[in-house]
Amino acid sequence: MSKGIHFEQSITELEEIVRQLEKGELSLEESLKQFEKGISLARRCQNALNQAEQKIETLTGTDSNIELDSDEQTSD
């Protein structure tokens, strides 16, 4: 569960960095610092998502193609 918390914290922090950069009020040096931090956070989040996807694929025994039971497939 702590990985989920870290993911959520990273997303929140990344959103804040984007807001700061979009305002355009930071100095060039501070903007570069925040951009670098944002890239690091984005990579960390992407890695967490990739790991979650792999775990789901392992648990379902598929590669993102989950088959529905015959009862779930009927739309009538």
Curated annotation (Swiss-Prot):
- Give the protein name, as stated in the record: Exodeoxyribonuclease 7 small subunit
Question: Which GO BP terms apply?
Answer: DNA catabolic process
User: Transmembrane region positions?
Assistant: none
* Reactions performed catalytically: Exonucleolytic cleavage in either 5'- to 3'- or 3'- to 5'-direction to yield nucleoside 5'-phosphates
Q: How does it assemble?
A: Heterooligomer composed of large and small subunits.
Q: What is this enzyme's EC? A: 3.1.11.6
Q: Which PANTHER family match?
A: EXODEOXYRIBONUCLEASE 7 SMALL SUBUNIT (PTHR34137:SF1)
Protein biosynthesis among the record's keywords?
no
Q: Which GO terms describe its molecular function?
A: exodeoxyribonuclease VII activity
Q: Which organism is it from?
A: Legionella pneumophila subsp. pneumophila (strain Philadelphia 1 / ATCC 33152 / DSM 7513)
Name the job this protein performs: Bidirectionally degrades single-stranded DNA into large acid-insoluble oligonucleotides, which are then degraded further into small acid-soluble oligonucleotides.
Subcellular locations according to the entry: Cytoplasm
